[in-house]
């Protein structure tokens, strides 16, 4: 099959939401509908030993939150779907941000009782920057919820995106009876209790069908009136607005009850864009080009605790990957052979014989691959737009056992390569300073150091409030700066010079004193 045909059948997307909106449940139900898993394990179920397929790391299983991005591929009808499940927890914004550079569209999950929440707003801003098309699933309709019209108003006013309802709920909570599909003019009736298998919903054709009155009684005429109102007050779905990220089609349902998910998935594969072209520092790379290219957006250490492994997740941008092929590693300026790239179904992995644009493959990484690296078949371009953010919180890392210094350094180096934390090594001392965007990341690092590297550490406070990458083309100025400011300078994990400011005032004074130097909050990988 040609590159064009392989590309056309693929859909690569991420699921975004505020914690506890039901994102992991929906992820699992999509896999269920795609036939990738037979049984949905109820997440956070204390009695059952089953855990959600996408929360595979031990810490995630314990806490019931996703803290790393999982990659899952599954077929659905005539399509192949690459689903990236992003962390919903506030402290893992960077991982989520970088994941959104690797997808062509997003699925936003909203809790019908809570509406738009802070994380949703933040993630939406990222999608807007990239004009990512978004489909919205309003979840938990089987519980008591806010009025649906109110939810649409809130999405439009807070997230600044037009809403186009495709399905509309009939009742809510214990009176939830189903959904009306505005485009198909069909009603799907809700049957509670069909948790684990994909049940066929009873379907009634046409909103004016007398059968509806038999099933719903007075609710049927209420529904007809409500739909008239909804049609008058909302935007009709049009694909162009959706693809530009200006309009979001809205679906209602209950993920835990498998209800409304099939309609969502059908619309998604039909309307969501196939893999798109990608910008580099020299040109736009189109997916249908013959030559292979791709970029690394994530590194994950110890996916398989039995093997001390590090996997680099690479999004294929063009051409075809074939087992054993040679690829050019642009940053290192060298050709490498890729024999054993992986494909993923959460933590299940298989060796990939071939892969195409939109697919995510895993490369075994022995410390030579970094986030943002580009691989090509000889061309020397670099994919752009994969950011690193300055840390906001800092801790000094101390060992409980001084003999484990080597293991500590190895663990911190490998974990910081994943991009959720940053390791700083000051010019003036042998201290190890860990930087993060949120407090939870420090817990995660301490937990993983102990479980994966057998190293116990403690944190101490350190006199650093913010970090800035130091950029300067004038070598003489940079040398003078290094000498004068060495007590506040460190190298990050990638060997980039960083200014660790003891206070905001100090940073402002230093920036004024050194106008030739750029103090950057973000750095391209």
From Swiss-Prot:
InterPro entries membership: EF-G-like_DII, EFG_III/V, G_TR_CS, P-loop_NTPase, PrfC, RF3_C, RF3_dom_3_sf, RF3_GTP-bd
Keywords, ordered alphabetically: Cytoplasm, GTP-binding, Nucleotide-binding, Protein biosynthesis
Places the protein is found: Cytoplasm
One annotated GO biological process: regulation of translational termination
Domain tr-type G residue range list: 8-276
Pfam families: EF-G_D2, GTP_EFTU, RF3_C
Domain of life: Bacteria
Residues bound to GTP: 17-24, 85-89, 139-142
Cellular component aspect of the GO annotation: cytosol
NCBIfam families, A to Z: prfC (TIGR00503), PRK00741.1 (NF001964), small_GTP (TIGR00231)
PANTHER family: PEPTIDE CHAIN RELEASE FACTOR RF3
Annotated function: Increases the formation of ribosomal termination complexes and stimulates activities of RF-1 and RF-2. It binds guanine nucleotides and has strong preference for UGA stop codons. It may interact directly with the ribosome. The stimulation of RF-1 and RF-2 is significantly reduced by GTP and GDP, but not by GMP.
Record's protein name: Peptide chain release factor 3
Species: Coxiella burnetii (strain CbuG_Q212)
Top-level taxonomy: Bacteria, Pseudomonadati, Pseudomonadota, Gammaproteobacteria, Legionellales
Gene this chain is encoded by: prfC
């Amino acid at each position: 099959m040609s590159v064009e045909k392989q590309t056309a059948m693929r859909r690569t997307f991420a699921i975004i939401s505020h914690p506890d909106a039901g994102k992991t449940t929906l992820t699992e139900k999509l896999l269920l509908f795609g036939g990738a898993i037979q049984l949905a394990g109820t997440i956070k179920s204390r009695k059952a030993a089953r855990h959600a397929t996408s929360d595979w790391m031990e810490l995630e299983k314990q806490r019931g939150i996703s803290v790393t991005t999982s990659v899952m591929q599954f077929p659905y009808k005539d399509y192949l779907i690459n689903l990236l499940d992003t962390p919903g927890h506030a402290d893992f914004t960077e991982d989520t941000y970088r994941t959104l550079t690797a997808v062509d569209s997003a699925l936003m999950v909203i809790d019908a009782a809570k509406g738009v929440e802070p994380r949703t707003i933040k993630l939406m801003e990222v999608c807007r920057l990239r004009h990512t098309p978004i489909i919205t699933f309003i979840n938990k309709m089987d519980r008591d919820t806010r009025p649906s019209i109110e939810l649409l108003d809130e999405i439009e006013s807070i997230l600044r995106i037009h809403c186009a309802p495709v399905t509309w709920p009939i009742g809510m909570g214990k009176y939830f009876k189903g959904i009306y599909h505005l485009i198909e003019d069909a009603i799907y009736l809700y049957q509670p209790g069909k948790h684990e298998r994909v049940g066929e919903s009873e379907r009634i054709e046409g909103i004016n069908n007398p059968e509806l009155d038999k099933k719903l009684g007075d609710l049927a005429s209420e529904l007809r009136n409500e739909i008239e109102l909804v049609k008058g007050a909302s935007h009709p779905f049009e694909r162009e607005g959706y693809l530009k990220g200006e309009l979001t089609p809205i679906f209602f349902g209950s993920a835990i009850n498998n209800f409304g998910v099939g309609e969502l998935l059908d619309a998604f594969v039909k309307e969501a864009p196939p893999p798109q072209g990608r910008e580099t520092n020299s040109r736009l790379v189109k997916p249908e080009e013959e030559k292979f290219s791709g970029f690394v957006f994530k590194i994950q250490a110890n996916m398989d605790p039995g093997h001390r492994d590090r996997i680099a997740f690479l999004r294929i941008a063009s051409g075809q990957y074939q087992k054993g092929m040679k690829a050019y590693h642009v940053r290192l300026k060298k050709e490498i052979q890729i024999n054993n790239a992986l494909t993923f179904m959460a933590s299940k992995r298989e060796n990939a014989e071939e892969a195409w644009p939109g697919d995510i493959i895993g490369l075994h990484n022995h410390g030579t691959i970094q986030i943002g690296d580009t691989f090509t078949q000889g061309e020397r371009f670099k994919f752009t737009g994969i950011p690193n953010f300055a840390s906001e919180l800092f801790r000094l890392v101390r060992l409980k056992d001084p003999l484990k210094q080597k293991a500590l350094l190895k663990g911190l180096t490998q974990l910081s390569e994943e991009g959720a934390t940053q390791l700083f090594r000051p010019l003036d001392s042998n201290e190890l300073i860990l930087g993060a965007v949120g407090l939870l990341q420090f817990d995660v690092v301490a937990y993983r150091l102990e479980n994966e590297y057998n190293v116990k550490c403690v944190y101490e406070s350190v006199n650093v409030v913010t970090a800035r990458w130091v950029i300067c083309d004038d070598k003489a100025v940079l040398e003078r700066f290094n000498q004068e400011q060495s007590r506040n300078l460190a190298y990050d994990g990638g060997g980039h010079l960083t200014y660790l400011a003891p206070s905001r005032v100090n940073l402002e004074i230093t920036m004024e004193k050194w106008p030739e130097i750029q103090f950057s909050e973000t750095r391209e990988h």
